[in-house]
């Protein structure tokens, strides 16, 4: 306990320190960047990495960014997606990102919840849930403005991806509720391939698979005839049982274990069999928690619906085995655990190794919300603009879920589905509602800012400036 208290004290001293010399940079940064910690509760401490805008940091918007999991690091966004520097394959150097979002805004990347990345619990207890995570993220946001008061009145945006589809709306709603006590110039929130509705994600995944030629026609016809009374479009596949559940299980098993890349249907999986991405495990545990338990479901198929089985298994503590090594994160792991890098970003020597995702966080995380509808409605009602963007080749959190979710919110539609363009080419499609924009990113998977960087830079720039896409 004495060591833990000393560690907490040491971290408090390092809060907000500027990064003076980041190892491996192949360019001279024209912006300030910081790495530090926020004590967000009696026992939880969150690590953050803050990059000021390259443009006008005294005036430009401020973005708080959260990756998902639950249990995966937001530094994936920094070093793989939209940060000013991107990790090279050698795991030692960083190259400049031409489409870094800090060319138009200052960005704060928060590793959340405690136990993720370099965030930790002073007593070792990292048990958390959706409400506690949003509360501690809110505390981190408030502490940021205390640490950097010059940004207090900047236009502020809360953004994230994947299970950030829960983190971001719950945090944004909490900021809305706290405006009287702690005013923030909150202008908008944005989600990338956000996990916004559990049942919709299951239903639309099957339809997505059929629409992309992944399901045998005979199986599809059987599913429609025997399980959906001839109308599969309105069929609730989460409630099917018996042989119908078996059909749906077989489809999901192929999507996750059939050799395809769930993050991007048309992107190859990493060919190195020794690479077993932790992000795959956490996606399986987070947004498709039963994918590793088909045999057990088959034995109990007459006793439970698919949805109930998914829900039960999402609360299971059993370890998962991920057999699809689609994403290679070794360069980030090597870089973030480099002793010189740790020293440069002020990581205490007695903190453990950094990892892209935390098994312990994911297996102990308690999911409370399966539908973000009430949160999004509250946010829009309070005049906070919402952007939902989806790469249209992602199978983990597919665009059809986001599209149906947006349409079912009950907001007035102001523009029907219409192409939007970048560089005179169709970059995706947009549907506009009062206070909310739903857009797709053509040819992008789960990490759209990484795989369609120019298009995403433009889309986010337009959103920040409140300009039409």
Swiss-Prot record:
From which residue to which does the signal peptide run?
1-16
Task: Give the keywords, sorted.
Answer: Carboxypeptidase, Glycoprotein, Hydrolase, Protease, Signal
Q: Name one GO molecular function term.
A: serine-type carboxypeptidase activity
Q: Which SUPFAM superfamilies match?
A: alpha/beta-Hydrolases
Family assignment from sequence similarity? Belongs to the peptidase S10 family.
Enzyme class comes to hydrolase
Q: What is this protein called?
A: Serine carboxypeptidase ctsa-1.1
Q: Which Pfam families match?
A: Peptidase_S10 (PF00450)
């Amino acid at each position: 306990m004495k060591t833990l208290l000393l560690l907490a004290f040491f971290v408090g001293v390092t809060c907000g320190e500027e990064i003076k010399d980041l190892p491996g940079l192949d360019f001279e940064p024209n912006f300030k960047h910081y790495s530090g910690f926020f004590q967000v509760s009696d026992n939880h401490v969150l690590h953050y990495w803050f990059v000021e805008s390259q443009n006008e940091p005294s005036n430009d918007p401020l973005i708080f960014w959260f990756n998902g999991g639950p249990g995966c690091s937001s530094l994936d966004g920094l070093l793989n997606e939209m940060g000013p520097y991107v990790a090279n394959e050698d795991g030692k150097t960083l190259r400049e990102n031409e489409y870094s979002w800090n060319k138009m805004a200052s960005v704060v990347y928060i590793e959340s919840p405690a136990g993720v990345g370099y965030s930790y619990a002073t007593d070792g207890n990292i048990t958390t849930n959706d409400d506690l995570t949003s509360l501690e993220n809110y505390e981190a946001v408030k502490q940021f403005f205390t640490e950097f008061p010059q940004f207090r009145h900047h236009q502020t945006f809360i953004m994230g991806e994947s299970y950030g589809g829960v983190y971001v709306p719950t945090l944004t709603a909490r900021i809305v509720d706290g405006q009287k006590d702690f005013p923030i110039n909150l202008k908008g929130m944005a989600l990338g391939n956000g996990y916004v509705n559990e049942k919709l994600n299951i239903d639309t995944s099957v339809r997505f698979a059929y629409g992309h030629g992944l399901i045998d026609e005979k199986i599809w016809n059987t599913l429609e005839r025997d399980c959906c009374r001839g109308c599969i479009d309105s069929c609730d596949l989460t409630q099917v049982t018996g042989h119908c559940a078996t059909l749906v299980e077989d489809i999901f098993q192929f999507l996750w274990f059939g050799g395809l890349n769930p993050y991007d249907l048309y992107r190859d999986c990493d060919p190195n069999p020794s690479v077993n991405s932790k992000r795959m495990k956490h996606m399986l545990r987070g947004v498709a928690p039963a994918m590793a338990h088909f045999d057990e479901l088959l034995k109990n198929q007459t006793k439970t619906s698919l949805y109930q089985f998914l829900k039960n298994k999402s609360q299971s503590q059993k370890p998962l085995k991920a057999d699809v090594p689609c994403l290679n994160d070794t360069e980030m792991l090597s870089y973030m655990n480099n002793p010189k890098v740790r020293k440069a970003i002020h990581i205490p020597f007695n903190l453990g190794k950094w990892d892209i995702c935390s098994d312990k966080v994911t297996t102990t995380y308690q999911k409370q919300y399966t539908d973000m509808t009430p949160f999004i409605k509250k946010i829009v009602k309070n005049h906070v603009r919402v952007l939902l963007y989806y790469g249209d080749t992602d199978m983990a959190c597919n665009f059809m879920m986001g599209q149906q979710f947006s349409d079912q919110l009950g907001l007035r539609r102001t523009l029907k589905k219409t192409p939007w363009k970048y560089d005179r080419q169709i970059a995706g499609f947009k549907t506009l509602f009062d206070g909310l924009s739903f857009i797709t990113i053509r040819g992008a998977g789960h990490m759209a800012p990484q795989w369609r960087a120019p298009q995403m830079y433009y889309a986010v720039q337009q959103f920040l400036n409140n300009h039409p896409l």
